[in-house]
Amino acid sequence: MADTLPSEFDVIVIGTGLPESIIAAACSRSGRRVLHVDSRSYYGGNWASFSFSGLLSWLKEYQENSDIVSDSPVWQDQILENEEAIALSRKDKTIQHVEVFCYASQDLHEDVEEAGALQKNHALVTSANSTEAADSAFLPTEDESLSTMSCEMLTEQTPSSDPENALEVNGAEVTGEKENHCDDKTCVPSTSAEDMSENVPIAEDTTEQPKKNRITYSQIIKEGRRFNIDLVSKLLYSRGLLIDLLIKSNVSRYAEFKNITRILAFREGRVEQVPCSRADVFNSKQLTMVEKRMLMKFLTFCMEYEKYPDEYKGYEEITFYEYLKTQKLTPNLQYIVMHSIAMTSETASSTIDGLKATKNFLHCLGRYGNTPFLFPLYGQGELPQCFCRMCAVFGGIYCLRHSVQCLVVDKESRKCKAIIDQFGQRIISEHFLVEDSYFPENMCSRVQYRQISRAVLITDRSVLKTDSDQQISILTVPAEEPGTFAVRVIELCSSTMTCMKGTYLVHLTCTSSKTAREDLESVVQKLFVPYTEMEIENEQVEKPRILWALYFNMRDSSDISRSCYNDLPSNVYVCSGPDCGLGNDNAVKQAETLFQEICPNEDFCPPPPNPEDIILDGDSLQPEASESSAIPEANSETFKESTNLGNLEESSE
């Protein structure tokens, strides 16, 4: 495959995370020749989403990754006298302390297959009692005896769309498209609902159903392609930088979104819904009439707090938590503002930080729905793929499973000249963007990383029952003691195309102080109970039951300055992995900053040209983007219940 690649590009991007994908799209849109490579077999890096079997394969890859022994660098012969090489790392050390627990009944048989699976490695199919299964499913831990796990591995990592789970709104049934991960060195393909219907037979939903409330592990395996499990758990602020970029660049046409329907609070051992809009506040039965007036008055002030500096003068240096106590708010209102609206730390957030966060929350209300947040159908892993698709449309070349052995640096200028790939091909470029996980240890010896604690749960019911079982919720559980951090809980229903019917996908996230399980297990125990056969028929069980759980720590390199990396060439730019924040603003800011260094004074991801405005002048095309091209046209196949950013933007403004 190497001889088919051109030998020279303007920009080479290594890694397909969200920041790298945005930069690749922006550079390609600006006319640069872009090569975008990743040694992984899937798009997104630590921003990726996986089907259930794909996630198990990912876990196995990380176990095998820890056993990699560096080979003798055969590319050294290609390094000239006036050059030196920076060997890139083959080990990804961004994920640690992985632990998997399976609570669902493990009546797994060898003939159970994932619906729509294209290829299976039978050597990796194991029985429920096999200790080999646990070893292949997660990295060894000190407490392996607590984790029983059986798994069916597939060599494919491809999540799929589900035309059967068509969304319904006002009686109208509609379907949409799902963009698949690539398994080879090709550009991002899209798969239509009609194509996917061949892989996921409609008859699957009408076959034998398990008895009420009983979900087995084999059923999760069989329905594994209905899961799209994110490695990083985030939401999109409706007026955040990423939404604005999606609309501006017209990349929004490649994705669909759903509104977060509920904001929840956990108080005195109970989960309750929090009012956040004006209508919610005045319709709330949780607040007294006096509290409603107090809350609306305070929120009105927060919307324009910069105009009234006297209101917070002298309080700038204290925490937002202490400031709220001075505002004559009841403890109930203080809790709601602190943990469900501002969503800031009681100990680490200043008054100004809290006021900014509250204003941002209120500013995003009402643009697309009753809450400030959106979630992409099929998971966060769709977003990097959307920008990769834009890059490919404008000529970018994509190669997955394509390792870069080293960066070639000129000794005199201290600039990077080229890369040498796994086939020994030298590829020249002017600019290089590298995801930080590819850098060797000697280059990162002065870097101090933070960690993110993550948990992913598959449960059988929502944390707060309502008439509808299709709720998407966010809940913040405050820190219990000094030195720990608040835990963010995002619960996704099956209409988000991230889990099978009858289940919920729950993501827990916090800044790490210990291992992920140590940080998050206490919150899990407050909200959920393990699934056991004895409780299946017990209708008095109030908490959701955990069918399957995954804990892991992920590196957070978002605040690392490039000066912390040793001997970094001036034309090599570092892209960090996900941060612990709820939104994606950090990734967008990083991408725009690096783009301006590569392409100064050029527009960042401008709208694509309207085909009607393209003027043919000799052999050159001179696209002129009309105003209307910045807002996507309605698609006849788009989800009506989900959010089309362009359409709603058009109607709301």
UniProtKB/Swiss-Prot annotation:
Main location, first listed in the record: cytoplasm
Keywords, sorted A to Z: Cytoplasm, Disease variant, GTPase activation, Sensory transduction, Vision
Any one GO cellular component localisation term in the record: cytosol
Composition bias type Polar residues, residue spans: 623-646
Gene from which this protein is expressed: CHM
Gene Ontology terms: biological process: intracellular protein transport; protein geranylgeranylation; protein targeting to membrane; small GTPase-mediated signal transduction; vesicle-mediated transport; visual perception
Subcellular location, record wording: Cytoplasm, Cytosol
Chain residue ranges for the region called Disordered: 606-653
Role of this protein: Substrate-binding subunit of the Rab geranylgeranyltransferase (GGTase) complex. Binds unprenylated Rab proteins and presents the substrate peptide to the catalytic component B composed of RABGGTA and RABGGTB, and remains bound to it after the geranylgeranyl transfer reaction. The component A is thought to be regenerated by transferring its prenylated Rab back to the donor membrane.
UniProt lineage: Eukaryota, Metazoa, Chordata, Craniata, Vertebrata
Organism: Homo sapiens
Gene3D superfamilies xref list: FAD/NAD(P)-binding domain, Guanine Nucleotide Dissociation Inhibitor, domain 1, Guanine Nucleotide Dissociation Inhibitor, domain 2
Domain of life: Eukaryota
InterPro entries assigned to the protein according to its UniProt record, in alphabetical order: FAD/NAD-bd_sf (IPR036188), GDP_dissociation_inhibitor (IPR018203), Rab_escort (IPR001738), RAE1_2_domI_C (IPR054420)
Disease: Choroideremia: An X-linked recessive disease characterized by a slowly progressive degeneration of the choroid, photoreceptors, and retinal pigment epithelium. Affected males develop night blindness in their teenage years followed by loss of peripheral vision and complete blindness at middle age. Carrier females are generally asymptomatic but funduscopic examination often shows patchy areas of chorioretinal atrophy.
Family: Belongs to the Rab GDI family.
Protein name, as recorded: Rab proteins geranylgeranyltransferase component A 1
